Amino acid sequence: MVGSVLCKRLQTLDIPHLKLSRHPSLSSEDQVFWDPDERILETEKLREVETVIHLAGEPVGKRWTHEIKKKIIFSRSDAGRFLFETLAAQDKPPKTLISASGIGFYGVANETKFDEESAKGRGFLADVVEDWESAPEPLHKVGTRVVNMRMGVVLSPDGGALAKMLPVFKFGLGGTLGSGHQMMSWIAMEDLIRAIMFFIENETLQGIYNLVSPNAVSNVEFTTILGWVLKRPTLFPVPALALRVIFGEMAMQTILASQHVIPKKLLEAGFEFQYPELEQALKHCLGREKN
């Protein structure tokens, strides 16, 4: 989802770029075939690449069976590590790696506000993110600048949490999830893409950065604002018990989890959010700015 939007932005700006693809039939001048399961990568096309942006990862928004957990781990840590080890072994490794990560690192806390200096939390996602962020170490060792982006909920009608909510809310069946008090740290897709470009352009930036709006909201606030933007009622709450029964562990660490995360380092670096408030962000991504 993010990769497709980013590629369109790069194309608009006439910035040459290559896309990794798992489909050999799609291999072309701007496509690079790779199969991390079989440890295959078309390295000859990557010799002159200066910046690598790694965004791959199995979606976490489904019940976490044993097999799903294995896919979540492999797609982030193992596949990434294979890519980074291969790139690090080239005669000319890339100058910059910008890699996706997640705010799941911080675990769950009802009262705490997390910034980049906050300690690792507990749970499956916290462990996944810790391993995910260690995967670029081979590139770090050869001098590549590494940026790890701990992303919050990315607002897009084309994928992720918002895309799953929209059909329900449009039918007027939306409502709060659980108590509704849990904090949700989000970022507009436009600001995420702008932040990636910001990291590319500012070569002194490296390390961990939280990619979330400065203004986290509670689930009650999110529900109310989304209903208002769509001009639909939000009268059908979903009990926490139902979510736990349906989604199990995943519900406790995502849907019902409270995470109030602050983009401290990003703001200190001078980044300016175009959509820092939820209402304007939702209106933009849903094409309702004139309403």
Q: At which residue positions do the language-model features occur?
A:
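NAD(P)H-binding glycine-rich loop region in Rossmannoid oxidoreductase-like domains
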Residues: 32-79
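Alpha-helical substrate-binding/gating segment
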Residues: 166-174, 182-217
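Mid/C-terminal beta-alpha module of Rossmann-like enzyme folds, strongest
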Residues: 202-249, 283-290
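Glycine/proline-rich active-site loop of Rossmann-fold NAD(P)-dependent oxidoreductases
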Residues: 130, 142-144, 155-164, 199-209
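C-terminal amphipathic/interface module of NAD(P)-dependent oxidoreductases
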Residues: 253-291
